[in-house]
């Protein structure tokens, strides 16, 4: 249902598991090539490598937005202003999204963007790696879901909408969130030092 749109769709693709999954499912379901976008620095852009691999695998029309240190510095003040927070982690994570969305708005006809946001909160990530047991994992996951509006959703909503784009977050579907949160948290714990489940 997130793929129905009156305007052209685009997909943010970091090369990580979450955005790659969203893009792969969309590529299978849509009758045309999807358009994917990634962003990286002009030096040491390891994420671009993985995004390119995912894009090649699913056969998307892929665009890489390359940014410099100067681009990041110039974006800092407007990003802090639009977020309305000085939370360092949120600001750091927002700069790339802000710049890629600005590039999409300025250079394409894309007006709707799908992202892989919220899956970390549902299935665990760095902040749940050290949970001593399943109950602590679930407690932290529930806390992260309750606070989404202060961090990831804040970042995605504002960085995307300030660039006149509409955000769609498949992992945020309420039925899916209910299902994911009902999974035994012991199954989501990082027991093998392999990252996400």
At which residue positions do the language-model features occur?
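ATP-dependent adenylate-handling active sites, centered on carboxylate activation for C-N bond formation
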Residues: 1-197
């Amino acid at each position: 249902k997130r793929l129905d749109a009156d305007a052209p769709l685009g997909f943010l693709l970091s090369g990580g598991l979450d955005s790659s999954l969203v893009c792969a499912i969309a590529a299978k379901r849509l009758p045309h090539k999807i358009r994917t976008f990634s962003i990286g620095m002009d030096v040491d852009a390891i994420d671009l490598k993985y995004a390119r691999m995912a894009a090649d695998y699913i056969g998307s029309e892929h665009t890489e937005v390359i940014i410099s240190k100067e681009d990041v510095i110039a974006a800092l003040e407007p990003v802090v202003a639009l977020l309305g927070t000085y939370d360092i982690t949120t600001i750091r994570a927002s700069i790339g999204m802000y710049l890629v969305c600005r590039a999409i708005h300025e250079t394409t006809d894309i007006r709707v963007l799908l992202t892989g946001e919220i899956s970390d909160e549902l299935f665990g990530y760095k902040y749940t790696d050290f949970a001593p047991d399943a109950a602590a994992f679930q407690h932290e996951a529930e806390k992260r879901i309750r606070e989404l509006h202060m961090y990831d959703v804040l970042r995605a909503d504002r960085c995307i909408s300030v660039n006149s784009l509409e955000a769609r977050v498949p992992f945020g579907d309420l039925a899916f969130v209910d299902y994911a949160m009902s999974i035994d948290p012991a199954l989501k714990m990082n027991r093998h030092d392999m990252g996400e489940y």
